Amino acid sequence: MIYENLVSEAGLTQKHLIHGDKELFQHELKTIFARNWLFLTHDSLIPSPGDYVTAKMGVDEVIVSRQNDGSVRAFLNVCRHRGKTLVHAEAGNAKGFVCSYHGWGFGSNGELQSVPFEKELYGDTIKKKCLGLKEVPRIESFHGFIYGCFDAEAPTLVDYLGDAAWYLEPIFKHSGGLELVGPPGKVVIKANWKAPAENFVGDAYHVGWTHASSLRSGQSIFTPLAGNAMLPPEGAGLQMTSKYGSGMGVLWDGYSGVHSADLVPEMMAFGGAKQEKLAKEIGDVRARIYRSHLNCTVFPNNSILTCSGVFKVWNPIDENTTEVWTYAIVEKDMPEDLKRRLADAVQRTFGPAGFWESDDNDNMETESQNAKKYQSSNSDLIANLGFGKDVYGDECYPGVVAKSAIGETSYRGFYRAYQAHISSSNWAEFENTSRNWHTELTKTTDR
C-alpha cells in the first residue's frame, strides 16, 4: 500500500479508507503507536509503592507499577518464558508478578527473580538479568498524568504536547491538580480508533444536531444549541492545533460542561471562585481557559472534555474495532460530594451506556464500516470548514488558531501530523516533513 497521499496538503481531505484498511492499521501500529506518547495512568491511581494498573499501548498491554523509590515503570504484560499474559487483574498492589503457566516470578521492577526448580532443570544456564520483562523505555508525567513511549528519538512529553500544553495547564496544574477516578468504564465499539479521536479533537459542529435529544433532556448550559436551533455566538470559542497533532476546541465559560441542571449551580460557583483567584496568579486569559470547556485530543488516542470531567482512551483492536476506556477527572480540592456526583454524571453521559456516548457511537461505527466498502473507501472525507481563517503567532493564543467555536482547524492539524507519521520511517523524517507545519496549515489559497 502507498501511504504518501492518504491525507491532502494541510489536512483538508482524507481518503475514507483510512478508517477501515487492514494493512494501514498494521502500519499505524509501527508508525503511530510505537512512536508517539501514549497515556498510561495517573498518579492518583497508583499512589503507593507496589500499586499497579494494566494499560494499553496500541494493541500491546503493559503493567504500570509504582516503584519503592516513588518512580513509575512500565513493562509488557508478557512472561519472558513462553509469552503468556502475566497479570490478569486491572489493578492491585503486589511486590511481584508470578506467571500462572510455569511459575516464573518477576519483581515489580521487572526483574526475573525466581524460576521453579532452577538448579535441577537449568543448572547455571539461566541469566536472570537478561530475562526481565520488556520495559517501556520512556515514562514521563504531565502534572500527574503518566504517558509512555517506546521510541527513544521522540521529543520530551512537554515538547510533544507543544502549544496544547499552554491551554491544558490552567486546569491540569494551576487549578491545584486533578484526580482520575477509576477503574475506567470499558466498552468495545465497531469503529476505527481515529473516528472518535478526530471527533473529540475539536468538533463542535455536530453537537447541536447529533446530541439534540441529549441536550434537551439534560438541560445543560449547551441546551440552546439543541436541534441546531442556533450557532454559538461570535466570539464564543476558538480552535487550535499543534505541530504534533494534539488540538482542541474551546467554548468560553462552559465550566459545567454537558452536565444537567442539578450540577450547574454548584459547579459554576466552584469554578467562578477559583477563576477569580487564578486571574491574580496566571492572568485573566488563562484563568478564563480554566473555567472554559475544552474538547481535546492528545495525539493519537487520548481525549479529554475538561469541564465535563470526561477522560477517554481509544484503544485500537483492529482496523474496525476499538475498546473505549472512560474515566472521570475531578479537581483535587472539590468537595467530596461534588467529586462523586461529577464522576457519576460522567458515566451517565459518556460512559459505556451514556446517552451522549450512544449518540456518538452510531456516527463513529457507520463512518468506519463504510470505509471498508469499495466505492466509499476511495472517496474523500472533507475537513475544510474555516480554512483560510487560521493564524499562527497570535499575540495571545499559541498554536495555529481560529477564533471561532465551530470549524475544523484541529481536524486538519490532527491529520497533517498523522500523514507525516505514516509516510515517515522515523522521528527525523517526521521533523523534516513538519518543518513548515504552521505555514502549511495557514495558507489561504483556494484548494
Swiss-Prot record:
One of its GO terms (molecular function) is iron ion binding. Fe cation binds at H206, H211, D360. It catalyses: naphthalene + NADH + O2 + H(+) = (1R,2S)-1,2-dihydronaphthalene-1,2-diol + NAD(+). Its cofactor is [2Fe-2S] cluster; Fe(2+). Pfam families: Rieske, Ring_hydroxyl_A. The keyword Iron applies. GO terms for cellular component: catalytic complex. GO terms for biological process: naphthalene catabolic process. Disulfide bonds: none annotated. Its EC number is 1.14.12.12. Pathway: Aromatic compound metabolism; naphthalene degradation. [2Fe-2S] cluster binds at C79, H81, C99, H102. Residues 37-135 form the Rieske domain. Keywords: 2Fe-2S, Aromatic hydrocarbons catabolism, Dioxygenase, Iron, Iron-sulfur, Metal-binding, NAD, Oxidoreductase, Plasmid. The naphthalene dioxygenase (NDO) multicomponent enzyme system is composed of an electron transfer component and a dioxygenase component (iron sulfur protein (ISP)). The electron transfer component is composed of a ferredoxin reductase (NagAa) and a ferredoxin (NagAb), and the dioxygenase component is formed by a large alpha subunit (NagAc) and a small beta subunit (NagAd). Component of the naphthalene dioxygenase (NDO) multicomponent enzyme system which catalyzes the incorporation of both atoms of molecular oxygen into naphthalene to form cis-(1R,2S)-dihydroxy-1,2-dihydronaphthalene. The alpha subunit has a catalytic role in the holoenzyme. Also able to use styrene as substrate. Belongs to the bacterial ring-hydroxylating dioxygenase alpha subunit family. This is Naphthalene 1,2-dioxygenase system, large oxygenase component. The lineage of its organism: Bacteria, Pseudomonadati, Pseudomonadota, Betaproteobacteria, Burkholderiales. The gene is nagAc.
